Amino acid sequence: MNMTTGRRGIVWKTPDITADGLKMFACIVMLIQTVGIAVIEKGLIHLDQYTQESLNQAMSQDSRLMTLAGIGSIMQLIGGMAIPVFAFLLVEGFRNTSDYKKYLIMMAVTALVSEIPYDLSICGKVWDFSSQNAMITMCICLIMLKCLDLFKETSGFTGGMLKVLILIAAIVWVSIFRAEYGLCMVLLVFVFYVFESKNVLKTVLGCIISLMYVTGPIAFYGIWCYTGERKNRINKYVYYAFYPLHLLVLGVIANYIL
């Protein structure tokens, strides 16, 4: 437990949060977000059948529909808090991994396995090219981190230009793939890596970027309380499995049960 003494002698206590704690928090809020999209919007409201105008008209005549739409929107806002945490943990994982290739391969395999569950739950189809899952964004971010690491000793104008070019390349790739969390995730990962030792600047920039998802800045409280402890009480493969499994289960519920 960290303690800070205020101007009037008041002692403020902040919790000690481990990597496991951050992972669990991110998974829970991501689950809430997916329930909001897959179950509420796709399964109960059938949002795709409405235009914005017809939806507004339907809600004005149906209080149940309005309530469901409101709940779905709130759940998606809650999910926005997961993005900064996942970005932060990705950078931490990159810095601490003993085998980058294995790390990237595991991420890529999870991305491939997750695509059909993602399309089913988020797009309402077994196969859809309109957007791709967030693990693809993380793979691109990992490659970006490796490129940044290769040129970390390059300083001055050349070093700065290389960093910018690598960042632009990553943004282009997530845009081509239309990957979930794309621009926000890439920018956050870049900030967390490049400004690692500048906690205040890193937090301010991260909060500004996270406003893309409205509630994102709230997650920085947990990141600020992170202790650096990475001992996994829960097997890391559980987290890899959680992403495609929760998408698959909610996708099946939304499309074949409701």
Locations of the language-model features?
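Alpha-helical transmembrane segments and their immediate juxtamembrane cytosolic regions
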Residues: 1-258
